[in-house]
Regions:
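Zn2+-dependent cytidine deaminase-like catalytic core
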Residues: 35-139, 283-285
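Enzymes that bind and transform nitrogen-containing heteroaromatic metabolites
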Residues: 2-28, 44-45, 68-71, 89, ...
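Active-site beta-strand termini and strand-to-loop segments that position acidic
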Residues: 37, 151-153, 331-333
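Short, hinge-like loop/turn segments at secondary-structure boundaries
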Residues: 122-126, 149-151, 221-224, 310-312
Length: 333
């Protein structure tokens, strides 16, 4: 097997391990690490389990059995994200790798965090360790897209999400229709998937009309996980701030500024779902404030209603799923 294929095989294992930290590692990135002996056996592996605790590299070295310690000098460590080179809540992982005397390091992608940005790789190379960077780089970046966007765009990763009928309506018109009930588009399975999605995001936003007409709880009820921070956006609000644990903001600019201020505390918002309504969703699209769009389409139609937002031109389909309703996920080109 070629070295490139070997490196990709072990990096896929790193990615597999990293995903175990999806809920508890935040706001840190998900990272996996695998230590492979010179004869191709995995002698240690780990992932970043929880924010404030040991990183993936630390846990991988801890898992190495005492009888295998002597193999480290000829071993390769695979890491899905560049090892940190600064003191935070834990010591630098780059220092640990150097101290352990590893022969080679394979890194999936460079860490965009301002305190790292290649410094970990440089430190390890200066110690005489052979370093390869960029193995499965796209997959490694996509795994931590929320972390990447926060550190490169200075804002949270933003997912726009709505459900629509087959003819493109997201709800009944409250002006032209006598129907006062909420239009039920999602089915039992897709509702569960919505709650799973909420558990993975830090905050969820709706506009004033949706808040006043539907009073959505926006909580995680059909999946295990922490409730996201509820945010309501309306230009009619004079003041920004919290009321009964709900964050109210009056503009997109104020939203980003408030979130960035909050990110200086322990209650960071690294990812945001925007659920509507149509005017609110369109305002994010028009402002270019989005990274992913997720549309659920039911097979039925209604004669009249509130039209779904217009999709931007710079999009590409990531995946299509079918659960009775069709879910299409788009990303920015």
């Amino acid at each position: 097997m070629k070295q490139k294929n070997i490196d990709e095989m072990y990096m896929r294992r790193c990615l597999q391990l990293a995903k175990n930290g999806r809920l508890l590692a935040k706001p840190n990135p998900m990272v996996g690490a695998v230590i492979v002996s010179s004869d191709g056996n995995i002698i240690g592996e780990g992932y970043h389990v929880r924010y404030g605790e040991g990183h993936a590299e630390v846990n991988a070295f801890r898992s190495v059995r005492p009888k295998d310690e002597n193999l480290l000098c000829e071993a390769t460590i695979y890491v899905s994200l560049e090892p940190c080179s600064h003191y935070g809540k834990t010591p630098p992982c780059a220092d640990l790798i150097v101290r352990k005397g590893i022969r080679r390091m394979v890194c999936g992608c460079v860490d965009p965090f301002s305190a790292v940005q290649g410094r970990g790789i440089e430190h390890i190379r200066k110690a005489g360790i052979d370093v390869t960077v960029g193995v499965l780089e796209h997959e490694c970046l996509m795994l931590n897209r929320e972390f990447i966007v926060r550190n490169t765009e200075n804002r949270p990763y933003i997912l726009l999400k709505w459900a629509q009928t087959a003819n493109g309506f997201i709800g009944y018109s409250h002006i032209t229709s006598d129907i006062k009930a909420t239009l039920q588009i999602s089915n039992a399975v897709t509702k569960m998937l919505v709650h799973k999605l909420r558990a993975e995001y830090d905050a969820i936003l709706v506009g004033r009309n949706t808040e006043e007409l539907e009073h959505p709880r926006l909580t995680v009820r059909e999946w295990n996980g922490k409730n996201p921070q509820k945010i309501v956006l309306s230009s009619t609000y004079k003041n920004n701030g919290f009321v009964d644990e709900v964050l109210y903001v009056n503009s997109l600019q104020q939203l980003i500024e408030t979130i960035n201020q909050r990110n200086n505390t322990e209650q960071k918002i690294c990812s945001l779902i925007v659920e509507g309504g149509a005017h609110t969703l369109q305002s994010f699209i028009d402002a270019g404030l989005w990274d992913e769009i997720r549309i659920e389409t039911a097979p039925f139609t209604i004669s009249n209603g509130i039209a779904a937002p217009h999709l931007p031109n710079n999009i590409d389909i990531v995946k299509k799923e079918f659960y009775g309703n069709t879910i299409v996920t788009y990303k920015r080109l």
